[in-house]
Amino acid sequence: MRVGVLGAKGKVGATMVRAVAAADDLTLSAELDAGDPLSLLTDGNTEVVIDFTHPDVVMGNLEFLIDNGIHAVVGTTGFTAERFQQVESWLVAKPNTSVLIAPNFAIGAVLSMHFAKQAARFFDSAEVIELHHPHKADAPSGTAARTAKLIAEARKGLPPNPDATSTSLPGARGADVDGIPVHAVRLAGLVAHQEVLFGTEGETLTIRHDSLDRTSFVPGVLLAVRRIAERPGLTVGLEPLLDLH
């Protein structure tokens, strides 16, 4: 399988370049960074592209890839409901093309989101804290936003988080994502970390995941690359490939 990498000179992109080059069943067909023409992907007969670029350019990348029938595995963040709808509309004309967009490709992070959804209905309170390096473009992270949405979905019909706060500085209680407070930390020395805190009378539960190195994303990305052709259309999240129930 011929695989191209967009964002190849970034920290995650460079990790993906090395991972693809080291895989016996994959061929690195192109490695592109800012300023490189996307036509290099078609020139190299690329079948699947890994995109770890920037929210400002990812939609243009996807439009090109879909138009050319190239499957896309996307780890770039900043996707909204409107952006997902746009991707789906592009895919209508290319029913055999696949796009997988995931907020996180670390297997442990995907599992932590799954565990959080399972635990959510058993606790009165839930909050999310995400911690990342200071170069991250978006806040809160896509992983934290998705985690909060999964928790809110699991708690549907239950009372909201108890919170007697009547006065606070703007932002002190975090961002409200479907009723779940999400707090973002940006700190030098961090990579990608998340805590989900649950509380009820007499006990708390903390689910924490730490990506200590960007190689933590490699197994999930390569899994998606190898299986993406099985899932025409848009897939959001890595969970469908892990057979989680």
Swiss-Prot record:
<dbReference type="GO" id="GO:0019877">
    <property type="term" value="P:diaminopimelate biosynthetic process"/>
</dbReference>
<feature type="binding site">
    <location>
        <position position="33"/>
    </location>
    <ligand>
        <name>NAD(+)</name>
    </ligand>
</feature>
<dbReference type="GO" id="GO:0005886">
    <property type="term" value="C:plasma membrane"/>
</dbReference>
<dbReference type="GO" id="GO:0009274">
    <property type="term" value="C:peptidoglycan-based cell wall"/>
</dbReference>
<comment type="pathway">
    <text>Amino-acid biosynthesis; L-lysine biosynthesis via DAP pathway; (S)-tetrahydrodipicolinate from L-aspartate: step 4/4.</text>
</comment>
<dbReference type="InterPro" id="IPR000846">
    <property type="entry name" value="DapB_N"/>
</dbReference>
<dbReference type="GO" id="GO:0016726">
    <property type="term" value="F:oxidoreductase activity, acting on CH or CH2 groups, NAD or NADP as acceptor"/>
</dbReference>
<keyword id="KW-0560">Oxidoreductase</keyword>
<feature type="active site" description="Proton donor">
    <location>
        <position position="136"/>
    </location>
</feature>
<feature type="binding site">
    <location>
        <begin position="142"/>
        <end position="143"/>
    </location>
    <ligand>
        <name>(S)-2,3,4,5-tetrahydrodipicolinate</name>
    </ligand>
</feature>
<feature type="binding site">
    <location>
        <begin position="11"/>
        <end position="12"/>
    </location>
    <ligand>
        <name>NADP(+)</name>
    </ligand>
</feature>
<keyword id="KW-0521">NADP</keyword>
<feature type="binding site">
    <location>
        <begin position="75"/>
        <end position="77"/>
    </location>
    <ligand>
        <name>NADP(+)</name>
    </ligand>
</feature>
<dbReference type="Pfam" id="PF01113">
    <property type="entry name" value="DapB_N"/>
</dbReference>
<feature type="binding site">
    <location>
        <begin position="75"/>
        <end position="77"/>
    </location>
    <ligand>
        <name>NAD(+)</name>
    </ligand>
</feature>
<protein>
    <recommendedName>
        <fullName>4-hydroxy-tetrahydrodipicolinate reductase</fullName>
        <ecNumber>1.17.1.8</ecNumber>
    </recommendedName>
</protein>
<dbReference type="GO" id="GO:0008839">
    <property type="term" value="F:4-hydroxy-tetrahydrodipicolinate reductase"/>
</dbReference>
<feature type="binding site">
    <location>
        <begin position="102"/>
        <end position="105"/>
    </location>
    <ligand>
        <name>NADP(+)</name>
    </ligand>
</feature>
<dbReference type="GO" id="GO:0070402">
    <property type="term" value="F:NADPH binding"/>
</dbReference>
<feature type="active site" description="Proton donor/acceptor">
    <location>
        <position position="132"/>
    </location>
</feature>
<dbReference type="Pfam" id="PF05173">
    <property type="entry name" value="DapB_C"/>
</dbReference>
<feature type="binding site">
    <location>
        <position position="136"/>
    </location>
    <ligand>
        <name>NAD(+)</name>
    </ligand>
</feature>
<feature type="binding site">
    <location>
        <begin position="102"/>
        <end position="105"/>
    </location>
    <ligand>
        <name>NAD(+)</name>
    </ligand>
</feature>
<keyword id="KW-0457">Lysine biosynthesis</keyword>
<comment type="subunit">
    <text>Homotetramer.</text>
</comment>
<keyword id="KW-0028">Amino-acid biosynthesis</keyword>
<dbReference type="InterPro" id="IPR022664">
    <property type="entry name" value="DapB_N_CS"/>
</dbReference>
<feature type="binding site">
    <location>
        <position position="133"/>
    </location>
    <ligand>
        <name>(S)-2,3,4,5-tetrahydrodipicolinate</name>
    </ligand>
</feature>
<dbReference type="GO" id="GO:0005829">
    <property type="term" value="C:cytosol"/>
</dbReference>
<dbReference type="GO" id="GO:0070404">
    <property type="term" value="F:NADH binding"/>
</dbReference>
<dbReference type="InterPro" id="IPR023940">
    <property type="entry name" value="DHDPR_bac"/>
</dbReference>
<comment type="similarity">
    <text>Belongs to the DapB family.</text>
</comment>
<dbReference type="InterPro" id="IPR036291">
    <property type="entry name" value="NAD(P)-bd_dom_sf"/>
</dbReference>
<keyword id="KW-0963">Cytoplasm</keyword>
<feature type="binding site">
    <location>
        <position position="136"/>
    </location>
    <ligand>
        <name>NADP(+)</name>
    </ligand>
</feature>
<comment type="function">
    <text>Catalyzes the conversion of 4-hydroxy-tetrahydrodipicolinate (HTPA) to tetrahydrodipicolinate. Can use both NADH and NADPH as a reductant, with NADH being 6-fold as effective as NADPH.</text>
</comment>
<feature type="binding site">
    <location>
        <begin position="11"/>
        <end position="12"/>
    </location>
    <ligand>
        <name>NAD(+)</name>
    </ligand>
</feature>
<keyword id="KW-0520">NAD</keyword>
<dbReference type="InterPro" id="IPR022663">
    <property type="entry name" value="DapB_C"/>
</dbReference>
<keyword id="KW-0220">Diaminopimelate biosynthesis</keyword>
<dbReference type="GO" id="GO:0009089">
    <property type="term" value="P:lysine biosynthetic process via diaminopimelate"/>
</dbReference>
